[in-house]
Swiss-Prot record:
<comment type="function">
    <text>Catalyzes the reversible oxidation of malate to oxaloacetate.</text>
</comment>
<comment type="similarity">
    <text>Belongs to the LDH/MDH superfamily. MDH type 2 family.</text>
</comment>
<dbReference type="GO" id="GO:0006099">
    <property type="term" value="P:tricarboxylic acid cycle"/>
</dbReference>
<feature type="binding site">
    <location>
        <begin position="11"/>
        <end position="17"/>
    </location>
    <ligand>
        <name>NAD(+)</name>
    </ligand>
</feature>
<protein>
    <recommendedName>
        <fullName>Malate dehydrogenase</fullName>
        <ecNumber>1.1.1.37</ecNumber>
    </recommendedName>
</protein>
<keyword id="KW-0560">Oxidoreductase</keyword>
<keyword id="KW-0520">NAD</keyword>
<dbReference type="GO" id="GO:0030060">
    <property type="term" value="F:L-malate dehydrogenase (NAD+) activity"/>
</dbReference>
<keyword id="KW-0816">Tricarboxylic acid cycle</keyword>
Amino acid sequence: XKKPVXVAVTGAAGQIGYA
């Protein structure tokens, strides 16, 4: 599932990693 914490971490760090 998608957890709020996880989403926040993967959302910020994820976009930086992909970008």
